[in-house]
From Swiss-Prot:
Name of one Pfam family that matches: Botulinum_HA-17
Name of the protein in question: Hemagglutinin component HA-17 type D
Primary location: secreted
Organism the protein comes from: Clostridium botulinum D phage (Clostridium botulinum D bacteriophage)
SUPFAM superfamilies: Ricin B-like lectins
Function, as annotated: The hemagglutinin (HA) component of the progenitor toxin protects the structural integrity of the neurotoxin; may increase internalization of the neurotoxin into the bloodstream of the host. Involved in binding to the small intestine through interactions with glycolipids and glycoproteins containing sialic acid moieties. The hemagglutinin complex composed of HA-70, HA-33 and HA-17 agglutinates erythrocytes, whereas the individual compenents do not. Erythrocyte agglutination also occurs with the entire toxin complex.
Top-level taxonomic group: Viruses
Length: 146
């Protein structure tokens, strides 16, 4: 894998699961989950390239001072701290990405993974797990520019 910058323009996006084509990353009541699409700001994510770190940061449009980050247990959550909030979206197809962390020594080791419960990802956590796989639809996300 190349560590070169994936070209993604700064701006607002919706993050859709490839696993279930109609579900979008949503921030609601203090947690993240994948829900059916809506026009609400809690399903819109501001993507910003941070040149000093050579990584991207996602903030929620409804909560602009909070960033997608991961904790010591591997859960991805919305944090008011910018710690553990830099990501490297690796393009694998048109508008399709595996999103890896920049905060761990080997950039390509850890990636967003949607936990599924018997093929149902609704209300399931998003994890930052090792060993990403381009054939694992639970790790592939579509970024739809708004």
């Amino acid at each position: 894998m190349s560590s070169e910058r994936t070209f993604l323009p700064n701006g607002n996006y919706k993050i859709k699961s490839l696993f279930s084509d109609s579900l979008y990353l949503t921030y609601s009541s203090g947690s993240l989950s994948f829900l059916n699409t809506s026009s609400l700001d809690n399903q819109k994510w501001k993507l910003e390239y941070i040149s000093s770190s050579n990584g991207f940061r996602f903030s929620n449009v409804a909560e602009p001072n909070k960033y997608l980050a991961y904790n010591d247990y591997g859960f991805i959550y919305l944090s008011s701290s910018s710690n553990n909030s830099l990501w490297n979206p690796i393009k694998i197809a048109i508008n399709s990405y595996i999103i890896c962390t920049l905060s761990i020594v080997n950039v390509t080791d850890y990636a967003w993974t949607i936990y599924d419960n018997n093929n149902n990802i609704t209300d399931q956590p998003i994890l930052n797990l090792p060993n990403f796989d381009i054939n694992n639809s639970n790790q592939i996300l579509k970024l739809e520019k708004l």
